[in-house]
C-alpha cells in the first residue's frame, strides 16, 4: 500500500543522539543516502534521501515523487534543528524547550534564580559519584531533568548514561546494574513513567533490584499540556509489589531519601519530587526510611487528622491553621512519606480521639494514596475524606482553577470537614 514514512533527521534527540540506529542514519547522511548498508532497505522498504530537508522546494519534489508509490517508502530528510533562528541553531539542546525570551537576543525574559530539584539532584549525584564509582546516573534522552548539562555529563564521564528516548531500556538497565552491585539512579519525568510500567514490574520489582527511580514534575504544578501531565504516576507506581515509593516534602527529605535509597540493597525505590518551588527548612533528617511505612505526626491534635502527601503536605498545614481559625479545633497533621504503604499502627491509634481523617494528594484520586487510607477505615466509624484531582485529561490549564474545580483549596476543604465535626 501507499505508506509514506517520513524520517526527520536533524542529528539530535533532545541532547545528542545515542544508540545504534543513529550510526546508520549518520552513514546515510554522509553518503547522500547511497550507502549500501541501509536499515530501511534491509526492512524491505523503498527509500529516498533529501539532503536539504529545510528547503520547501526539495521537500515538495520528494513527496511528489512518492505520493503514488505502490510500496511503503521512507523519505529520509536531513534537517537542521533550530533552523532560521541563530541562537537555536547555535545551542540546539537548550532550545529544544525554552520559556519566553527576547527575540532579538535569545535571552530569557525572566531570570530563574530559585534552586530547583534538577540542580539539587545533579550536585548531589556528582559528589556521590566522585566518592563511589558504583553510582551511575541514567537518563532516557532528557539529561537536564537531573541537571546534567553537557559540561556536567563530561564531568560525570562513564558514570552518566543516556540510553536515548527509551524509558523502557533505562529501567531494564538500572535493574541490571543494581543486580550486579551497582547503584543506579534513573531520573525521569512523571509523564513518561507509563512507558516504563512493564520494566518496573517485570525487570525491577520481580527481581527486587535495588535501583532508584526519581520522578520529576509529578504534580499539578508540573507541565500542563495534555501529552505531558504528571498526575497519574501514583496509581501506576504505588500498586506494584516490592516497590517503595516515597514522597518528600522538602529538599532535606529528598536528599535523605536519595542517600538511603542508593546505599540500601533490599528494595527498588521511587522518589516522587514535590511540585512548585523547592522548600528547604534546614532540618536534619534522621529518619530511617528502611523502617517502612512509618508516618510522622508533625502536629498532635484531636478530632481531625490531616494527612498531606508530598507537595500537598504544605496545604495540609494550611488546612489545619484555617480549621483552627474557623472552629477552634486543633487538628493532627501527618507527613506520611510513603505512598506505597500505610502505617496501620498510627491509623489505628487515631481511632481513639479522631472522628475525621482527610488525605491530600497531588494527583488523581482513583487508585491513589487516599483510597488506601479509606480502605483501612472501611469497617470503622471513622469518616475519611479524600482530596485530589478527578480522573481526566487536562490541557493548558490554570492551576488555581483546577484546584478550585476539584475542591482542593484550604477554604473548601475546611467547609467539607465542618460537615462532620
Predicted features and spans:
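Helix-enriched interaction subdomains in cytosolic or periplasmic regions
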Residues: 100-102, 238-283
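Thiamine diphosphate
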Residues: 2-94, 110-124, 128-155, 162, ...
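Short beta-alpha junctions and helix-cap segments that line functional grooves
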Residues: 62, 199, 257-258
